[in-house]
Swiss-Prot record:
Entry protein name: Small ribosomal subunit protein bS21
Family per record: Belongs to the bacterial ribosomal protein bS21 family.
PROSITE patterns: RIBOSOMAL_S21
Lineage: Bacteria, Pseudomonadati, Pseudomonadota, Alphaproteobacteria, Sphingomonadales
Protein's gene: rpsU
Entries under Gene3D superfamilies matching the protein: Ribosomal protein S8 (1.20.5.1150)
Organism whose genome encodes this protein: Novosphingobium aromaticivorans (strain ATCC 700278 / DSM 12444 / CCUG 56034 / CIP 105152 / NBRC 16084 / F199)
Source superkingdom: Bacteria
Length: 68
């Protein structure tokens, strides 16, 4: 990954780098790989995330359909 430093402005370049890393999901990946995760824990985490996504989608549908 490459960030250009313009006009010797390192702070702005660091902010751009952090934003890029955040968008790419590097921080999330680092957090997940910090410790070994058992396959059963991984399945449970992924299932919980799927349930959260489904609930969120259903809430959005209810809001959209209820507004009509």
């Amino acid at each position: 990954m490459q960030i250009l430093v313009r006009d010797n402005n390192v702070d702005q370049a660091l902010r751009a780098l952090k934003k890029k890393l955040q968008r790419e999901g590097v921080y999330r990946e680092m957090k997940l790989r910090r410790h070994f995760e058992k396959p059963s824990e991984k399945r449970a985490r992924e299932k919980a995330a799927a349930v959260r996504r489904a609930r969120k989608l259903e809430r959005k549908r209810q809001e959209r359909d209820g507004a009509k």
